[in-house]
Amino acid sequence: MQIEHSIREKLQRAFTPQVLEVVNESHLHASHASSPGTGESHFRVVVIADAFRGKSRLDRHRMVNAVLEEELAGRVHALAIKAMTPEESLPAA
């Protein structure tokens, strides 16, 4: 769980999110040829933070990718990102 912990710590530090979910989905891809077999290659993150206010979806993804540059250059093969402001995370009325 080293990479998962690192992802969680870095995102928490960078964005001080109201909600942070880090889900290791590597087990869903274990049989894929591109899977390194480490058990920490595919992740999904949900980050709800004020830091995304006024930013486009592309800019938000770039922000997350920049924070996790080291992990993405290494053993992380795939990262699904959902980055929202607190207001965007509220259910539609």
What are these regions (language model features)?
Residues 29-32, 42, 61, 77:
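Histidine-centered active-site/metal-ligand motif
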Residues 32-49:
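A short, structured beta-strand/loop element
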Residues 1-36:
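N-terminal first-folded block
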Residues 52-57:
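Short, conserved charged micro-motifs
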Residues 23, 46-48, 80-84:
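Solvent-exposed beta-strand sheet faces enriched in polar/charged residues
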Residues 58-93:
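C-terminal structural segments of small proteins and small subunits
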Residues 16-18, 39-43, 75-79:
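A generic structural signal for short beta-strands and their flanking turns/coil linkers
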